[in-house]
Curated annotation (Swiss-Prot):
Catalyzed chemical reaction(s): cytidine(1402) in 16S rRNA + S-adenosyl-L-methionine = N(4)-methylcytidine(1402) in 16S rRNA + S-adenosyl-L-homocysteine + H(+)
Organism name: Trichodesmium erythraeum (strain IMS101)
Name by which UniProt lists this protein: Ribosomal RNA small subunit methyltransferase H
Binding site for S-adenosyl-L-methionine: 31-33, 50, 77, 93, 100
Described purpose of this protein according to its UniProt entry: Specifically methylates the N4 position of cytidine in position 1402 (C1402) of 16S rRNA.
Subcellular locations according to the entry: Cytoplasm
Keyword Protein biosynthesis: no
Coiled-coil annotated residue ranges, if any: none
Organism ancestry: Bacteria, Bacillati, Cyanobacteriota, Cyanophyceae, Oscillatoriophycideae
Length: 283
């Protein structure tokens, strides 16, 4: 499993891991951040949740030597109920992990041919294919514009309607690319990037679930406990920024977001858009 956690040293130092502390990893993925938390201080325990059962199962194997210090939970962070637990720190890494992105059958990437799926939680019924092949033109254009900030949203939606049915990621990517002026088709950013982002957000209801999590999570912290959120695009970062700032029980610790150093981006290009924001519970 080749997934490199992003901004890991900045996150771990920002959370100030305490001996015998209890931490919530709200987006376990393949366990990179959890492993670093457990190694940062003695007798630390982590509650690790993820909506992706495949990632959760893999992490239980990868973190087998730490399992006595980890409680695994299959849940979306918006639905998680800590009951009576209070945490010394909470983290959420909002990015799609590299393993999901590089697994063609998950349908997240236009770089690999696979079915248009994009579900983080494989138990849910709505897929990218259902949206692409059954939604009306106006609704498609709206999600491309709102969640992808795609300026050609109407043109792309119209072309999708004309080209349906579309079954694979590469078919959709080709339709989108053909809507873009030729000189922009082969730049650094693939022309389908924004459409794929918008679809993934819609399929998984990412922003509404993030909003719920950000409203609930501060109340799960002990006084003096910290929360760190890593976002990867402007819609997420804006929501994180305003939610942390508007929570009366939190003190924001990052006036501006922490971003990766050049050497991290050189090793892991997917880190380039990451932003970390931190806050501490006051009362």
């Amino acid at each position: 499993m080749n997934h490199i956690p992003v901004l890991s040293s900045e996150l771990i130092s920002g959370l100030v891991i305490r001996p015998r502390g209890l931490y919530l990893d709200a987006t376990l993925g393949f366990g990179g951040h959890t492993k670093l938390i457990l190694a940062a201080a003695p007798e630390v325990k982590v509650v690790a949740i993820d909506q992706d059962k495949q990632a959760l199962d893999s992490s239980q194997t990868l973190l087998a030597s730490y399992n006595s210090n980890i409680q695994f939970c299959h849940s979306n962070f918006a639905d998680y109920d800590p009951q009576n637990l209070k945490f010394d720190g909470i983290l959420a890494d909002l990015g799609i992990n590299s393993v999901q992105l590089d697994t063609p059958e998950r349908g997240f990437s236009f770089r690999h041919q696979g079915k248009l799926d994009m579900r983080m939680n494989q138990q849910q019924t709505i897929t990218a294919a259902k949206i692409i092949n059954h939604w009306e033109e106006v609704k498609l254009a709206n999600i491309f514009y709102t969640y992808g900030e795609e300026r050609l949203s109407r043109r792309i939606a119209r072309k999708i309607i004309e080209s349906r049915p579309l079954e694979t990621t590469t078919e959709l990517a080709e339709v989108v690319a053909n809507c873009v002026p030729y000189k922009y088709r082969y730049g650094r950013i693939h022309p389908a990037t924004r459409v794929f982002q918008a679809l993934r957000i819609e399929v998984n209801q990412e922003l509404s679930r993030l909003e719920t999590f950000l409203k609930n999570a501060p109340h799960w912290l002990k006084i003096g406990g910290r929360i760190g959120i890593i976002s990867f695009h402007s819609l997420e970062d804006r929501l994180v920024k305003h939610s942390l700032r508007n929570a009366s029980i939190l003190k924001v610790l990052t006036k501006k977001p922490i971003q990766p150093q050049d050497n991290e981006v050189a090793i892991n290009p997917r880190a380039r858009s990451a932003k970390l924001r931190l806050a501490e519970k006051l009362s």
